[in-house]
Regions:
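Membrane-inserting effector segments that mediate pore formation, membrane fusion
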Residues: 110-160
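Alpha-helix boundary/N-cap detector
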Residues: 35-42, 109, 113-117, 133-140, ...
Length: 247
């Protein structure tokens, strides 16, 4: 430590002070940290968007060291960069997600409704019905749901051991056979017009309703593959040397 002159000012009434000097012999270096892991997730277009903005960064996007996994059942695309470099590897996952309101309807699921409960839900979501007037009529029908049940029981036994044991139940109600919705099935995709059937399950006084749409199931299969194929086409044009693997 070089000799340096210092000036010390005393408070009134003080005549002396003790000065302590601490000399550091080691440099105070910052610790060396591992790079942060890049693990991103978003909509089905996320992989293409990431590549579009980073394709010029050769250290990050070496196409021969990247690959994309395609899972059509889970409706996902997963990009992995720097595949052999655990310190600098990055993953970007894009997923085709269902439109939240479509899920709320519970179409083609095990979800069931009480008639009054379903009428309230339809009333609050009239914007998704093709015909607003028909929506109000359907709401009224559900609020005043009526059903009659015709049951037949046949039970007999013959001397030769033959036995008959049959039970049949026919439910007649004021519910319409079907109605039409206009709603997106997947996020970021256009709205689809689908025909929806109301299925009634009557057990004594317990009445549960469910919504079924074969047409929606067809659209799910078609749109899932269409959306994924559209993204793969864009990716192949942008980065043709990235390996694309179907799972």
């Amino acid at each position: 430590m070089e000799n340096e002159k210092m000036q010390v000012n005393f408070a009134p009434g003080m005549t002396e002070a003790t000065l302590r000097v601490i000399e550091l012999h080691e440099e105070n270096e910052l610790p060396v940290l591992e790079p942060d892991k890049v693990e991103l997730a978003g909509t089905i277009g996320s992989v293409h968007e990431f590549l579009l903005k980073r394709i010029s960064e050769k250290e990050q996007i070496n196409q021969k060291r990247c690959y994309i996994l395609v899972d059509r059942e889970k409706m996902t695309l997963k990009l992995v960069t720097n595949e052999t470099d655990s310190r600098n590897k990055a993953t970007v996952r894009g997923e085709l997600k269902y439109y939240p309101k479509f899920l709320e309807f519970g179409i083609n699921t095990s979800k069931t409704w009480e008639p009054v409960q379903l009428s309230k839900f339809f009333k609050m979501n009239c914007a998704f019905f093709k015909d607003a007037q028909y929506n109000m009529e359907l709401v009224t029908v559900l609020k005043n749901f009526k059903a009659s049940i015709d049951s037949k029981v046949e039970n007999s036994r013959q001397d030769n051991g033959s036995r008959t044991d049959n039970y049949s139940q026919v439910v007649n109600s004021n519910l319409p056979a079907s109605f039409n919705l206009i709603v997106p099935i997947f996020k970021g995709r256009p709205a689809e017009e689908i025909e929806v059937e109301i299925i009634a399950d009557v057990d004594g006084r317990n009445i549960r309703l469910s919504l079924c749409s074969p047409g929606a199931e067809v659209i799910v299969e078609e749109e899932r593959n269409k959306a994924i194929d559209e993204q793969l086409l864009l990716i192949r044009k942008l980065a043709p040397d990235i390996a694309i693997i179907e799972q």
